[in-house]
């Protein structure tokens, strides 16, 4: 039986937000460069399936479907697991829609004999749901050096402290800091 790792990959502001109050995230893009692109490409290539909520799927689909290059290839060709109670059809594929019990469905994805990780692309609400349930095995967080003052955090309202160990970090030329963290168990 397989036990694939669930990795939550997100970019966050210095003050801990993944999106602005209106749900936008354009403030993060100026901090991306060749070195951070390589970091991201590696995680995408290791993925066996991209997991995301409906909003992320609807935002990412048109962008990546119209893009080219190694990152676009990794995003477009690998299967997507879309978690939604309202999405009826997933056109950016290959994709499978999950709308039931989150804990059971993540366990199903982890147990599949497919290769690679379950790479979760936030939104903050989906990320928060996974984190609250203790379903994330590894966090790959890139913090960009900008404070946005308010927004949506994947770590808001967890109910208890989430203690993490930093197992790797890399600083990019732009000043962004990527960290791999695992929950203390």
Regions found by a protein language model. Name each.
Residues 1-185:
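Enzymes that bind and transform nitrogen-containing heteroaromatic metabolites
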């Amino acid at each position: 039986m397989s036990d694939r790792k669930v990795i939550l990959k997100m970019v966050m502001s210095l003050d801990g937000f993944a999106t602005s109050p209106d749900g936008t995230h354009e403030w993060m893009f100026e901090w991306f460069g060749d070195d951070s692109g390589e970091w991201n490409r590696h995680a995408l290539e290791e993925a066996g399936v991209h997991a995301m909520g409906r909003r992320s799927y609807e935002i990412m689909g048109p962008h990546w479907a119209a893009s080219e290059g190694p990152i676009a290839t990794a995003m477009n060709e690998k299967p997507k697991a879309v978690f939604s109670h309202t999405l009826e059809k997933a056109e950016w594929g290959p994709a499978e829609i999950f709308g039931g019990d989150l804990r059971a469905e993540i366990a199903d994805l982890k147990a599949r004999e497919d290769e690679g990780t379950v790479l979760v692309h936030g939104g903050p609400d989906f990320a928060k749901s996974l984190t609250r349930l203790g379903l994330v095995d590894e966090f790959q967080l890139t913090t960009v050096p900008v404070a946005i003052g308010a927004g949506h955090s994947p770590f808001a309202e967890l109910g208890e402290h989430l203690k993490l160990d930093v197992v790797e970090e890399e600083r990019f030329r732009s000043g962004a800091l990527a960290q791999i963290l695992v929950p203390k168990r």
